[in-house]
């Protein structure tokens, strides 16, 4: 009897256990179904997007190909009724540059090129309309053809073909401009000129990767450096040489509107492996050598400065230059004196070319500590340059412990430096940023870019040549995209919590500081693709999102693409604004799934031109 009782108890316990397991399975099944239905806390974000009309599918209806004509808007009638439609600006604004407006510039002093510096329109003068493309506008040629040919309709200015006719800058042929690769200092072409420089400067082994071209003209120097895997940041003012920077960008060469005047250059300290001036008309010896001191600030230890043209070899050329030899002699004396004060070593002088090299550290420059002319900059942050006045002072080298140590850290040759840990990271120069955090950021951007390519298969095919990252961070987006087919302008906002542009340059990438509450220093329609990572969250309560989006529209080419990554609530607001901007747009889930609150907004700008009342 006892045995039978024990057996019955065991069966009862087994039945209870089975019931408990079954009940738990049912509970979790019901819980999962409840969450998936849209009423669970975990999917409240997805529900919000559904209720707001957001579409998180993989943008099957967006067309990234170029057709020179846009498609009808994707915004439904009910949604369109709620959005503000931005009207086209008048046709006279096709090449409007808000912070380098010619009429406004003429109200400022001409001393030290102040009138050519950035002078942005006050709030009551801002244009709240869409900048039109000129009639006949077409998508630029693909690289490398774009290096040599630009459609006339895109930049219809023939002034340079007359002014620079004998210098072989640019020629007008039928419906295109042709760029023969010549220049004032390139009588045998830019390639031959660069060959001469390369006999002194190591351009072929990745040691020299980033370059600065001051007063770049149409940027032929930067264009022909491309095949040597050197990336030049070129700048020139918006002046009587109409559209020179616009031509550079139409050719697919990195360039911005800029000038050496009274304000520091918008680049970090120790950014460039070499700097270049070919008849750039900058008075290098003036203001106690202040302009050379600014070049020294942005030049890496061991970097090179090239001066081509007056006053080099003035004894032979003063008659051809139609300048008094006494003036040229004095100009060169001041340059040599400033270079000596900076402790640069003259490496080469032949014909009209001279090359100096900056020392790798200040071990050989101790004697200048006692020179009364050597005024050292007192600032603790040499990268704090936005709208800061230039000073006639020498930027100190970072400290070193031996005579052969490179101040600030030695960089690997490119392409190894692209993914190596930059010295600014490994040395702990950026507070709160560790090597692990940097490497994790790289992994994340490789993952993000892989997802972008699934959405837009044309991303790395050459369809998009000029790309901008509006909030670049460490340059992870650009590094993941790195290719001979494209380049990325890495913009670090001046209000960013951490200044990472120095890291961008240490990776062998290029970029610039900018405040997106103002217009960028470029012409309209100069970028094929714009990427904005958490930019609108960053500028929340700082300035109007409408103004930022209108600026994006100004600098984006017709049929260009936009990728905006941000929190979903921010993107819903952005999507509502761009519904009135002649963009086609879709919201896409994060690559890790719909429950991630970060989403991606993909957009394509429609094709339309001046005097058009609707898209073609």
Swiss-Prot record:
InterPro entries tied to this protein: Put_SAM_MeTrfase, SAM-dependent_MTases_sf
Domain of life: Eukaryota
EC top class named in words: transferase
Subcellular location as annotated: Golgi apparatus membrane
SUPFAM superfamilies the record matches: S-adenosyl-L-methionine-dependent methyltransferases (SSF53335)
Topology class, membrane: Single-pass type II membrane protein
Keywords (A to Z) from UniProt: Glycoprotein, Golgi apparatus, Membrane, Methyltransferase, Signal-anchor, Transferase, Transmembrane, Transmembrane helix
Record family assignment: Belongs to the methyltransferase superfamily.
Additional remark text: Co-expressed with the galacturonosyltransferases GAUT1 and GAUT9.
Name this protein carries in UniProt: Probable methyltransferase PMT2
Classification lineage: Eukaryota, Viridiplantae, Streptophyta, Embryophyta, Tracheophyta
